[in-house]
């Protein structure tokens, strides 16, 4: 195969991606398949970091809308991401990988604190780093956490796995004539009001010139194909 197009990546997975066909929790078969994908990418020579959402367990913003204090809800959501990170760590380690979970909030008996230089060192030593608890602050999504961590570790590419296979001009689930974009600039996304990620995360990525690829991860081997330069999903980078 060809040389890798990206040396260091951060993959953002939604918590819902771990549910499979269920409506709550973690499907062992799904997390095992995702772990195989990640290890395949690392064995090809990439340094791989992960951020996983917590929506399969708890979504703070949702309960805040029902009356719960937003800060409390967001803290509960952060803990949900730690649960998912530990589950992924277990799945990866069972396949022989060396993994470190690093949290933005202190849970020292469970995982490491996030320290930027240590995170980079883990990657350089061939370990997979899983960043949990978002940014450690309420009112910020795990998309923002993923963008922030990707910038901090100097990732060559931020990958966001979604339920659809890229960015469309309109909702492909509602419109059969929806058109998928192969590439976009950050300015085009703003001007066309396209849904890529939340505003804070998008601004971080744009201002740091961080390439972002939106793609679907349902097809086996897709992550490795992206690393080898295949144009899968939608690439967002640069300005108009």
From Swiss-Prot:
GO cellular component, one term: cytosol
MF annotations from Gene Ontology: ATP binding; UMP kinase activity
Residues holding UMP: 54, 74, 135-142
Catalysed conversion reaction: UMP + ATP = UDP + ADP
Chief localisation class: cytoplasm
Pathway in which this enzyme or protein is active: Pyrimidine metabolism; CTP biosynthesis via de novo pathway; UDP from UMP (UMPK route): step 1/1
Protein name: Uridylate kinase
Organism: Xanthomonas oryzae pv. oryzae (strain KACC10331 / KXO85)
Ways its activity is controlled: Inhibited by UTP.
Gene of this entry: pyrH
Subcellular location: Cytoplasm
One Pfam family linked to the record: AA_kinase
Cited NCBIfam families: pyrH_bact
InterPro entries (alphabetical): AceGlu_kinase-like_sf, Asp/Glu/Uridylate_kinase, Uridylate_kinase, Uridylate_kinase_bac
UniProt binding sites for ATP: 12-15, 55, 59, 162, 168, 171
HAMAP family: PyrH_B
């Amino acid at each position: 195969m060809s040389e890798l197009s990206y040396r260091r990546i951060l993959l953002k997975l939604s918590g819902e991606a771990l549910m499979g066909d269920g409506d709550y929790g973690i499907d062992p078969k799904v997390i095992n398949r995702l772990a195989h994908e990640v290890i395949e990418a690392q064995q090809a020579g990439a340094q791989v970091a992960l951020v996983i959402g917590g929506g399969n367990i708890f979504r703070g913003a949702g309960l805040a809308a029902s009356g719960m204090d937003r800060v409390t809800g967001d803290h509960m959501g952060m803990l949900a991401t730690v649960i998912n990170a530990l589950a992924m760590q277990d799945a990866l380690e069972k396949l022989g990988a060396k993994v470190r979970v690093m949290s933005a909030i202190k849970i020292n008996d469970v995982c490491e604190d996030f320290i930027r230089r240590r995170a980079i060192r883990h990657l350089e030593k061939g370990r997979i780093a899983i960043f949990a608890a978002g940014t450690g602050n309420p009112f910020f999504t795990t998309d923002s956490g993923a963008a922030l961590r990707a910038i901090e570790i100097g990732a060559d590419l931020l990958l966001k796995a979604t339920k659809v296979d890229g960015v469309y001009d309109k909702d492909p689930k509602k419109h059969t004539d929806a058109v998928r974009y192969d590439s976009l600039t950050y300015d085009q996304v703003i001007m066309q009001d396209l849904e890529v990620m939340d505003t804070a995360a998008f601004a971080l990525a744009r201002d740091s010139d961080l390439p972002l690829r939106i793609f679907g991860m349902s097809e086996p081997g897709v992550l490795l194909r992206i690393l080898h330069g295949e144009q899968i999903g939608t690439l967002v980078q640069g300005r108009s």
